[in-house]
Amino acid sequence: MFWWGDYSVSTEHMVYLNLKNGIPAPRSDSAEMNGLTIAEKIDGQIFIDTWGLIFPGDPANAAEDATITASVSHDKNGLYGAAFISACIAQTFVTNDIDELIDIGLSFIPSDSTYAAVVRAVSKFHAQNPDIWRSCLEYLQQNWGYDRYGGNCHIIPNAGVCVMLLLYGRNYPRAVEFSTMSGWDTDCNAGNVGTIMGVAC
């Protein structure tokens, strides 16, 4: 299932039209060709839950295949989100320790990426403010919000929300509930986090 929203709006539709017009992969989906706004939309991580589920306990293969899949239409942080989420899902079959899951996810993405930076920032905020999830949401809105990134659904703010939901939710119902209350891409974040927490339960 892909979002068909027209050229320069929907990542998948734009890449499809690039391919149809004779621009071969991987140039058809590259940030150099399409710009970071398109290459780093949230779609890179929201369609890859399956890889974590078919590689239970094997985050390396889950991250690799999720990255390959996401690379059809995304680049850079769009790929890192695919690797991070799928690795977390796969590792959840081994442990339900949220901090360990986050560390595993981080081990499959570049440590100097913006994606890794938002994950670490939310983890640090939670360590210092472990009780009130809304304070973390306010922190994300002020420091990692949509106003800082191009397009209508960038992966970075939503990655922050996903990590916040894992850390503050701590169980399936709360994590999904907090997701729908947090705004931004509520259904996608609930889907990713719901998969992780669903396996963990």
Model features per residue range: what roles?
Residues 1-201:
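Structured, active/binding-site neighborhoods that engage oxygen-rich ligands
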